[in-house]
């Protein structure tokens, strides 16, 4: 059998090299395409990232106007003015700003609740900026991305507060909260001009974040001390005491027979004294 000529062998090798090169190029381009697809965010994610950056930028602008004097350029705090905000998280900012306690009017024993200066959207922007510079406890959101409110009314909330959640929440509230806020969340006096506020005006997210972050004189309740579901049950109890109707009229702080008995005793004594004085003046 005749051996192929050197020219034919050379041509075959050239064809093989060409085919191998084309195959390698195809594999390389395909791999690069797959890798690019894997690491490049889709349009939805990229849009979300841009939205987050826009929110943080808006929050920084608001911070520079309202907060920088007391909390510093880098959120590090200013001596005798305001504490560091590094690591406090979205939750603490939402509670303080949304409840109107911040910006504070003047330094005193305790910041009072007042009408908020900023809208909820602006509050969330400031919270996003602070969280972007140190992290910390976050807000609670629903699956659709909206801020959780009524959804925090108990572990088993389904549009209505359940009696089981209220019962558990009541036990937890009396154990952990009643010593300061009294048995129905109406507040009470503390030492050195401080006080535990009435909880009627607080929304569900504010109450949740107050338990989580421990603002001002309040202790922190981490998820190890009170789980997320236990916090929700406490909120269910607080909201149930506010919204429970009072068939007898004015609830007298919802303190029960002690307050009602005291009122009737004082009122009755006054009526008797007035009647005695009237009888005396007629004789």
From Swiss-Prot:
A GO cellular component annotated for this chain's UniProt record is: plasma membrane
| Reactions catalysed | a quinol + 2 Fe(III)-[cytochrome c](out) = a quinone + 2 Fe(II)-[cytochrome c](out) + 2 H(+)(out)
Knockout consequence? Cells lacking qcrCAB show strongly impaired growth in glucose minimal medium, which indicates that the bc1-aa3 pathway is the main route of respiration under these conditions.
Subunit arrangement?
The cytochrome bc1 complex is composed of a cytochrome b (QcrB), the Rieske iron-sulfur protein (QcrA) and a diheme cytochrome c (QcrC) subunit. The bc1 complex forms a supercomplex with cytochrome c oxidase (cytochrome aa3).
Domain of life, per UniProt, equals Bacteria
Q: Which UniProt keywords apply?
A: Cell membrane, Electron transport, Heme, Iron, Membrane, Metal-binding, Repeat, Respiratory chain, Translocase, Transmembrane, Transmembrane helix, Transport
| Summary of the function given for this chain in its UniProt record | Cytochrome c1 subunit of the cytochrome bc1 complex, an essential component of the respiratory electron transport chain required for ATP synthesis. The bc1 complex catalyzes the oxidation of menaquinol and the reduction of cytochrome c in the respiratory chain. The bc1 complex operates through a Q-cycle mechanism that couples electron transfer to generation of the proton gradient that drives ATP synthesis.
Domain Cytochrome c residue range list: 54-134, 164-242
Q: InterPro entries recorded for this chain?
A: bc1_cytC-su, Cyt_c-like_dom, Cyt_c-like_dom_sf, Cytochrome_c_Oxidase_Subunit
Phylogenetic placement of the source organism: Bacteria, Bacillati, Actinomycetota, Actinomycetes, Mycobacteriales
Care to name a GO molecular-function term for this sequence? iron ion binding
EC annotation?
Answer: 7.1.1.8
Identify the residues that bind heme c 1: 67, 70-71
Main location as per UniProt: membrane
Which residues are noted in the entry as heme c 2-binding? 177, 180-181
Q: Mind telling me which residue stretches traverse the membrane in this protein?
A: 19-39, 261-281
In the bilayer, the protein is annotated as: Multi-pass membrane protein
Name where it's found. Cell membrane
Protein name (database record) = Cytochrome bc1 complex cytochrome c subunit
Q: Which Gene3D superfamilies match?
A: Cytochrome c-like domain
Give any extra note attached to this record: No stable monoheme protein can accumulate if the incorporation of the other heme group is blocked; assembly of both the cytochrome bc1 complex and the cytochrome bc1-aa3 supercomplex depends on heme assembly.
Q: How is it modified after translation?
A: Binds 2 heme c groups covalently per subunit.
